[in-house]
Amino acid sequence: VYSTKDMVNWTDHGSPLDLSSFSWADDRAWAAQTIERNGKYYWYICAHSKLTGGMAIGVAVADSPTGPFKDALGKPLFDNGSWDNIDPTVWMDEDGQAYLYWGNPHLYYAKLNKDMISFKGGIDAKAAVDKKREVGRIVMTEEGFGSPDVEKRDSTRKYKDCYTEGPWFMKRGKNYYMLYAAGGVPEHIAYSMCKKPFGPWKYMGEIMPLEDTGSFTNHCGVTDFKGKSYFFYHTGKLGGGFGRSVAVEEFKYNADGTFPIIHHTQEGVAPIATLNPYKRQEAETIAFSKGVKSEQTDDTGVYISEIHTGDYIKVREVDFGNESPDAFAISAACSSLGGSLEVHLDKEDGELIAKLDVTKTGGWEKWKTFSAQMLKKVTGKHDIYFVFKGLKGSKLFNF
């Protein structure tokens, strides 16, 4: 889980949920979504079921978005042995009715009870896929999603589009939206709209066209934050990263409520707030980093480790105000020779404004405060680079 106040500096809160939290699951913890209701946070997940051998939908609950989460049921929320059951998406309407959608290559749906961990039922008999009529399936049409259901598609025809996976269900104003990965492999993002939670849907076209993202899949999420709209998706462009990495673009809805075309960029979004250097800021609040890794323990929580010479952490839009600070302090732990931390302005080898040495503290989680006077005065807004120096090949300290 990551959080932000400014859209560019993100705080790593660690992993509050693990596949092992679900006794019935043994593999493939894929896409998920979380929602809040009455002070509780519900995390809808998909995973491979040991009970049926297919994919299943589960739900975990916590008192905080940072967890810890626990399996709310001790069993799947929905498990019929099908491999279709992936990528759950959840939305709660103004009247308090919550809805769950999921599926690849078909799109399934259910009404959630107020407890958020059981299905309400009452699904139309023609759409229901279970005897209890708790789960329905959307019938794909060319008008609704650009093509019919996969088993009804004509291989000799070229359709406008086709739903594949990764649904994102939401409402804005009077319109319901279904965003989804489309086109098979490789995937782009398309969407459909309607006036009622279960349709009838109308295909609206692409949002993010097929582009060189370095990933043959895509999966999006949309939110408004501090008066701006953001489109999250994933790429494979992060050098040294494993698999997929999260990206985000700012956008504005068209006047009629439809989406504009949104393109993948290298720059991402602009900051919408500043970072206060006169308050304690966690080392795991980062805009960009090189070399370092975050770790998590019960005693400390999340911290930055695997620090070696030449590594650095960047934070953006740090506002020092009109008067310069006199000193700089960090919390560090060290069980080796230690090293130094240099503070540079605006680039990795920019102006050096502070430097402090970290020495042995007696253990990798024996935390101690280290401080140093500022070498130069600094005012205004800057990007800050924390550059680590020390013996080559040696782990320097934890931060």
PLM region descriptions:
Residues 1-355, 359-399:
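Carbohydrate-active catalytic/glycan-binding domains of CAZyme proteins
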